[in-house]
Amino acid sequence: MCGIAGSIDLAGKRLPDRAMLQRMAAALVHRGPDDSGFLSAPGVGFAHRRLSIVGLLDGRQPIYNEDRTVAVICNGEFFDHPERRAELEAKGHVFSTHSDSEILVHLYEEYGEELFSHLKGQFAFALVDLTRGIVLLGRDRVGICPLFWSRQGDTVYFASEIKALIASGAVRPDADPRGLDHLFTFFALSSRRTAFKGVQALEPGHYLRIELPQGRGLASPVERKYWDFDFPDWGDELDGDVEQLTDSFQSVFERAVDIRLRADVPVVGYLSGGVDSAFVLATAARVAGRPVPSF
C-alpha cells in the first residue's frame, strides 16, 4: 500500500506549490512510511509515499522512462510484471529499476493509452507525458486501490485518500448530504459519489485523461471506461460438465493466487474467520509448497 497525490493546472502553465505537495504527502505517510518522492513541472505536480514491496533498493518514485519524458507514480502491484518486463525488454525498452511499477512508463511508450489492456493487477496511478502534455489517472478494473479527485477552479487535485485532498488547502471538507444519505442507508457509496461535496472517486475500470493546452484556454478532464464485466447472455450454456468446470476454476484460481505471492518481502495471510479467506490461504500454502504465516 502506497499513497499518491498531486495537482494539475488545467492551463498547463503554473508550477505546483511544493509546500502543498508536501502537505498532501504528509497526509498519506501512514500508507507509505518507507520513502517519498516528488515531481514538479509546468502544470503538473506529483507526490508519492512508498511502502516497499517489490524493488526495495531502487524503486523510488516518480519513475521515468529512458529519456525522462514520461513519469509515473503508482499505488498497487502488477502481478505479471516479470513477464511484461521481459516482453518490453525484448522490444528494446531499458529498465532502470526493479520496481514492478516501471512497466507503466514503458507500456505507455509502446501502446499509448491502450496500456490498460496490458495490465494485470490492483493499482491507482498518475502518469504524465511531459512532451505531449498528457496526464492519465488510472484505476484498476474492480477498484481495489482508491483514487479520488476534485476540480477546484482551473486545477484538478487527486489523491489516494480524501484527507490528502483536504490537506492541499484547496478542497473544503464540506459534507454532501446525498452522499451521507447513501452511506447511512446502504452502508456504502456508489462507485463515483463520496461523502464530501466536490470530491468524486475515479470509477473502477476507468481512467481520467487531461491534455494540457499548448496555448490559451483550459483543459477539460475526460473520464473514459477501459474495462467492464462481460456477463453471459441469458440462456447461454457453459461448455463442459460440473467436474470439468470445477477443474477449470481450480486451475484459474491457483494461478491467480500464485502470481500474488510474488514479493521481495515476506508474504502473510489475513484470516477473517470465513470460508473464503481460509480457502485463499490454503491455496497459497499449496502452491507455495510451504505454510504461509497468518493472522
What do these predicted regions represent?
Residues M1-F295:
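Cysteine-centered catalytic environments shared across enzyme families
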